[in-house]
């Protein structure tokens, strides 16, 4: 049976992640409140940010920036977008 969560991003009951994506309290919070769909959407957006803004994941400031953007993304706040990116038409 698929585990569901009340997704913080989409504000609806959706299938959850299979396991916490991070260790510790942050990973448990994501596991409990973020759907698999929202997590997959974040991973795509995160990749755009890393590439377009040339973030270095070995740099603590870049990791902190990305963590902040992830929090904004899931909470519904305004979050950074890749400059000039136009999503494909569906």
Curated annotation (Swiss-Prot):
Keyword field: Iron
Bilayer-spanning residue ranges: none
Molecular function, one GO term: iron ion binding
Any matching Pfam family: Iron_traffic
One Gene Ontology biological process: cellular response to oxidative stress
Cellular compartments per GO CC: cytosol
Family the entry assigns: Belongs to the Fe(2+)-trafficking protein family.
Task of the protein: Could be a mediator in iron transactions between iron acquisition and iron-requiring processes, such as synthesis and/or repair of Fe-S clusters in biosynthetic enzymes.
Name under which the protein is recorded: Probable Fe(2+)-trafficking protein
UniProt organism field: Pseudomonas fluorescens (strain ATCC BAA-477 / NRRL B-23932 / Pf-5)
Lineage, uppermost ranks: Bacteria, Pseudomonadati, Pseudomonadota, Gammaproteobacteria, Pseudomonadales
């Amino acid at each position: 049976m698929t585990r569901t969560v009340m997704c913080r991003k989409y504000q609806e009951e959706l299938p959850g992640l299979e396991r916490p994506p991070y260790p510790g309290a942050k990973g448990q919070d994501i596991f409990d409140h973020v759907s698999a769909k929202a997590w997959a959407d974040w991973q795509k957006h995160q990749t755009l940010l890393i590439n377009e803004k040339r973030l270095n994941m070995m740099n603590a400031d870049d990791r902190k920036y990305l963590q902040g953007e992830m929090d904004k993304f899931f909470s519904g706040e305004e979050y950074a977008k890749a400059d000039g990116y136009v999503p494909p038409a569906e």
